[in-house]
Amino acid sequence: MKNKFNLTREQNVFVAKRNIVDYIWKSANLEGIGVTYPETQVIYDGGIVNGLTVDKIIAINNLKYAWQFILENEDIEYDYKTLCQIHKLTCDKLVLDQNLGRIRSTPVNIGGTKWKPEFPIESQIKEELEGLLNQSEKTKTEIAIEIMLWIMRRQMFIDGNKRVAMLFANKIMIDNGCGIITISQENQPIFFEKLIKFYETGDNADLKQWIYDTSIDGIELSNN
């Protein structure tokens, strides 16, 4: 699985900033936060949107702050601490303080399937993440997608796992000039169908390839 894009970090950050509202809008809807693109733009710009719940407005602002965090902090490690920090940013005021930036201690149910994720154990999470990162034979794009899917299936937090997964993966993508993982609105039903299958089987091959084929954004640079 080759890198689709070979950008500098500066170029990749430019791509992200240029399309940031679109990425936030799609990410929010992927997590079931029903907002329109214009509403997302207004919230991002600090405006007021009538008719939206407070939680939806908070969720959009949290995604804004989390994106700023990954774009402005090149030197942060791809580790458990960063996972927890991203969760703090994305879920601030949306989960109880005792759950913010901490792995869950209660069971969770997954919509659309009877499958249930196992309880996360901090030492196992750290070991599994390190193993995924240290795959020298794979490209950064493939590693980022695998880590994103692992976070989603692991369900280590009480809420917001897909948001955390995409942000953490995109931190890896951006730092290595590989583009941006973003799932379009029209592709989200297919994504969820494949995600449920992945949850139930643990086999990421089909979903990983589909994300690679359909859901990586970037720019082609001219050689001139």
Predicted segments, located by residue:
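FIC/Doc superfamily catalytic core
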Residues: 1-224
